[in-house]
């Protein structure tokens, strides 16, 4: 069992007789006699299930003046005019199914705005209900997330310790590589000079105050042996001479 729900109530609305539409440009409220409305009364927008009806009623007695069933919005049943936001063209129907088009006007723009919002919300709800019913009847397609035959995937894993640092192999690698090559063995020592140069440097350093002319010869020991040998030979000759003389 469905219950009626009142979506909106406006205590005062105006109804106008409108001329036939001259072209496809739409209705214009400026073509109506706005100062002399045909009828003035109350408007109620009532929903029953997915159906919604705009009812025009007497202010005092609540007697029904006209019904405007609305099957879609915007649509033929209710249409906004092209020159004002406060006026609409509605299609009213009697119990015999006869219909007529009338002009509907509000004294304030906020009233027409409320009617727009109420109709939009209702038909949005109807659309959602239809979608829910459609999902119930149609089987839902399940996604196949399994691997197909011959399909492989590649996973890159980065294992970390509990303290947040990386593995030991990578840590040791990072610590050992500082980015600077070590020096070659013995690279920091001086190159040894040749033996002759070393001896000359040693002689100069030991006797800095002796001139080259007074410096003793390098082969001093050999010269002494030679001189002593010559002296001994002279002594032997003199001895021989003395022996002859004797």
From Swiss-Prot:
Residues 181-196 have a biased composition (Pro residues). Residues 227-246 have a biased composition (Low complexity). Signal peptide: none annotated. The keyword DNA damage does not apply. CDD domains: PHear_NECAP. Residues 156-246 are annotated as: Disordered. Residues 166-177 have a biased composition (Polar residues). The WXXF motif mediates binding with the GAE domain of proteins. This is NECAP-like protein CG9132.
């Amino acid at each position: 069992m469905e219950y009626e729900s009142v979506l909106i109530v406006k205590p005062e609305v105006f109804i106008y007789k409108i001329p036939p539409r001259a072209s496809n440009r739409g209705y214009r409220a400026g073509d109506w006699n706005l100062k002399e409305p045909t009828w003035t009364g109350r408007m109620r927008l009532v929903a029953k299930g997915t159906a919604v009806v705009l009812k025009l009623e007497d202010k005092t007695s609540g007697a029904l003046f006209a019904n405007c069933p609305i099957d879609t919005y915007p649509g033929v049943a209710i249409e906004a005019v092209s020159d004002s936001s406060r006026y609409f063209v509605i299609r009213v129907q009697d119990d015999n199914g006869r219909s007529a088009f009338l002009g509907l006007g509000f004294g304030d723009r906020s009233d027409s705005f409320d009617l727009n919002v109420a109709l939009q919300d209702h038909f949005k709800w109807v659309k959602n209900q239809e979608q829910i019913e459609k999902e119930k009847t149609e089987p839902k397609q399940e996604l196949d997330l399994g691997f197909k035959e011959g399909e492989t995937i590649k996973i890159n894993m980065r294992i970390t310790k509990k303290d947040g640092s990386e593995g030991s192999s990578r840590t040791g690698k990072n610590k050992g590589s500082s980015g600077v090559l070590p020096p070659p063995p013995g690279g920091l020592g001086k190159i040894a000079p040749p033996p002759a140069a070393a001896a000359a440097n040693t002689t100069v350093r030991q006797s800095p105050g002796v001139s080259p002319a007074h410096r003793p010869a390098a082969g001093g020991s050999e010269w002494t042996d030679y001189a002593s040998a010559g002296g001994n030979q002279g002594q032997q000759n003199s001895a021989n001479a003395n022996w002859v003389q004797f």
